[in-house]
């Protein structure tokens, strides 16, 4: 390593920094052992040959209406096989879900007692729950019986080629289930990447990524595979994709087009480079870059406003590009290892696995600020809230806009780093050494600490990161930085966090003296003189003005939008 850039993981890079070392799953007071992961739901209109555009209803997918009204399905208790599968003459798509049993409460079915009250079914559910160590209170446990309805027709797997979301209605609520087909041919070809001489692209706390003939192969643990499959199914259905769609890029989101739940392997496609490694910035191509940023912002909006999913790990290392020299042709947002469904959908989601004919529950969302984002790209408001309550949770108020804006604020941190590289007259490498090295060192400090075991040290590390973010922000928006600084200072003062307040002040003042604006002045002036450069800076400024929880209600639909 020749330039000594240290990443937020404490790794030497060329000069690449990977996402921070994920902290091991931690025990939460009152939660099941190892609970951290979560996920859940929203809507879509009735299934036809393809899922149509999404609405704003309260389920991930809307119920499938069936014209076959007189049949009642009896289920094989092992996995709920539909006894009249062969005789059923419903239309191709309508027969995917098994008639009125999907729309009625389980307790209204003639065979409800046999199916849902049987010890075998209860034991099976309890076994699934226990195997995943998911915390469920009694009410949640009781409602899980409705998941039995999702399994009444295994022929769904014959109609899809990739994970796909379907809705299941009970009398009182709707459940969202992603069906995950098992492709034996792909399994045999890709599920042992070490033996096929696949090239290692990356290694992280959640698994490895390999490249084999432009196919990205991700090996992960069970939880990460469940998340990958569930989110892929939600995105595919909410986008209106055809049931047989095998696309892995939808609305600038990179998703798995095949997930082997047996080997915990997900497949997608490879890209030239990630955004952190991209060094060919040229301020003259700002229109190209602004267009790319707009597409990525739209991806964040789709993920939150339509799919009800927070990404929670937006960073340059999770944005992949194809480019030729300084021109970026396409970019995608990827990696859902930290993603969570909006918590108002807790307890309503699962995946149905073809390979073992079983259900896998999707863990619930906790929305803990300390579990969100790479500390080096965490939104100002999230770091500020950690200083008040290290293990505090984000209150989205059941408002998708608030969740969306939180992700967009992290996206703003990414764009800020790009602008500093773009405008530094010394070049990208020097910009990384000068503007990013200290930020990464401070972020490393937070990454290495467990907030439950060392809450005060973790809080102080996040406080220093927050101060450094404001320092870097002041390089571009020096007229606004005083207002932002004072707003954060007053927030800590009013909450009685005097130690954090003083550390924030001292770090900001000290680091401001060490940071020169001179290297970017010429490039920044060039950026301001162009139409798209001015738009970029305006939109970036507006996102950074979201620095309190109240600001998360702002309408940001016009920002980074072509």
UniProtKB/Swiss-Prot annotation:
One of its GO terms (biological process) is viral process. SUPFAM superfamilies: Protein kinase-like (PK-like) (SSF56112). InterPro entries: Herpes_UL97 (IPR010615), Kinase-like_dom_sf (IPR011009), Tyr_kinase_AS (IPR008266). Its EC number is 2.7.1.-. One of its GO terms (molecular function) is ATP binding. It comes from the Viruses. Keywords: ATP-binding, Early protein, Kinase, Nucleotide-binding, Transferase. Coiled coil: none annotated. Residues 1-32 are annotated as: Disordered. The keyword rRNA processing does not apply. ATP binds at residues 201-209, 218. It holds the Pfam family UL97. The keyword Transmembrane does not apply. The active site is at residue 313. It is an enzyme of class 2 (transferase). Residues 1-16 have a biased composition (Polar residues). Phosphorylates the antiviral nucleoside analog ganciclovir. Belongs to the protein kinase superfamily. Tyr protein kinase family. HCMV ganciclovir subfamily. This is Probable ganciclovir kinase. It comes from Human herpesvirus 6A (strain Uganda-1102) (HHV-6 variant A).
